[in-house]
Regions:
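Acidic donor-binding loop of glycosyltransferase active sites
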Residues: 98-100, 257-271, 279-280
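Structural loop-to-beta junction motif characteristic of Rossmann-like glycosyltransferase folds
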Residues: 57, 121-122, 260-261, 278-286, ...
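Glycosyltransferases and closely related glycan-assembly transferases
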Residues: 88-101, 109-124, 137-141
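A short, well-ordered alpha-helix in the C-terminal region of glycosyltransferases
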Residues: 333-347
Length: 365
């Protein structure tokens, strides 16, 4: 199958954290051969549809809901949806003549990966977190390959299947630019993942109100998420703080490259993008992530010296302002953090995954 057209189906839905690493992989498949066809399977959520449409990919939908953290009755009801979701997935895979199925974790992956196994289609899973989620642990035994970002996650899977390669990052993040200054100011980028984070939003608002140093030092770009956008925008307006407030940044590669300092969640995709761009960061892990994987991710980066971690339970405007002022008063430390972030990047994750996928498909011919 070397050099031949391949039809790829990717189970990746819900949030940008699941979507963007898969999009990076999909784009590289299509860059190598324009005839390669990629279909995403997702939930039909507005943000997901918007991201995929913006990136130029088609999406099919299956009816499935999460199980972890839903309560006993809801979990049992949602388990009952799985057989139908597997059947729906099998129909999509047949209709697309799928040669390869990629699962990215989350509750969309198991039905699609199981359907691929039943149809004897090659299947791989991507696990970008330091502690694998339940979905990938469940389908790990039937996956042909398991791609990891953290070496410490290896013991959750069969050793022969595991490849530690990093997290795919879109090619746009590798285009070098210099940190942008607006009116002589550095750029502070704030985002709480693709859906935003109310706790981070509130802390940044309070920090900017309280800290004249922050207001004088930074031009602020703040991705709020759709739900919290109007509240945050109104709060800045009432306080007279000049901030660029947007619900979602489709041009994140350009904006992140231009940032001097970043305040963000610690999803695996975000951490990979920060490393590629060599950005120092203040990380606020999402406290309700399955198996607390965001804190594990953040601590791993903190140990390298590339980030400062503030737990959400400890996050206030005063604490955030203190950390930001401390970093900006020691530019040499900020530079060291950026250098250590850059040193942790893995530039060949996408290429390694694609080569492994091609080897798998060639082995079936």
């Amino acid at each position: 199958m070397t050099g031949a057209q391949v039809n790829i189906v990717i189970a990746a839905g819900g949030t940008g954290g699941h979507l963007y690493p898969a999009i990076a992989l999909a784009k590289e498949f299509q860059r190598q051969d324009r005839e390669n066809m990629v279909t995403f399977i997702g939930s039909g959520k507005q943000l997901e549809n918007s991201i995929l449409a913006h990136e130029g990919f088609s999406v099919a939908h299956i009816h499935v809901k999460g199980i972890v953290g839903r309560g006993l009755w809801a979990s049992l009801k949602n388990v009952c949806l799985l057989p139908k979701a597997v059947w729906q997935s099998m129909k999509i895979l047949r209709d697309r003549s799928a040669d390869l199925v990629i699962g990215t974790g989350g509750y969309f992956s198991p039905p699609v990966v199981c359907a691929a196994a039943l149809l004897k289609i090659r299947r791989i899973i991507m696990e970008p977190n330091a502690v694998p989620g339940l979905a990938n642990r469940v389908v790990g035994p039937i996956a042909d390959r398991v791609f990891l970002a953290f070496d410490g996650a290896k013991h959750y899977f069969h050793e022969a299947k595991v490849r530690v390669v990093g997290t795919p990052v879109r090619e746009e993040f590798f285009r070098e630019t210099t940190a942008r200054q607006q009116g002589g100011k550095d750029t502070l980028l704030v985002f709480g993942g693709s859906q935003g984070a109310k706790a981070i939003n509130t802390a940044v608002i309070d920090a900017l109100k309280a800290s004249s140093i922050m207001r004088e030092t930074f031009a602020v770009i703040h991705q709020t998420g759709e739900v919290d956008h109007e509240r945050v925008k109104a709060a800045y307006a009432s306080s007279g703080v000049d901030v660029e407030v947007v619900p979602f940044l489709y041009d994140m590669p350009q904006v992140l490259q231009a940032a001097t300092l970043v305040v963000a969640r610690s999803g695996a995709g975000t951490l990979a993008e920060l490393a590629v761009c060599g950005k120092p960061s203040i990380l606020v892990p999402y406290p309700h992530a399955t198996h607390n994987h965001q804190e594990h991710n953040a601590r791993a980066v903190e140990q390298t010296g590339a980030a400062v971690v503030i737990l959400e339970a400890e996050l206030t405007g005063q604490r955030l302002a203190h950390e930001i002022e401390r970093l900006m008063s020691h530019p040499e430390r900020l530079g060291e953090m950026g250098a250590k972030s850059f040193a942790g990047r893995k530039v060949d994750a996408t290429a390694l995954m694609i080569q492994e996928c091609r080897d798998l498909m060639n082995a079936m011919v």
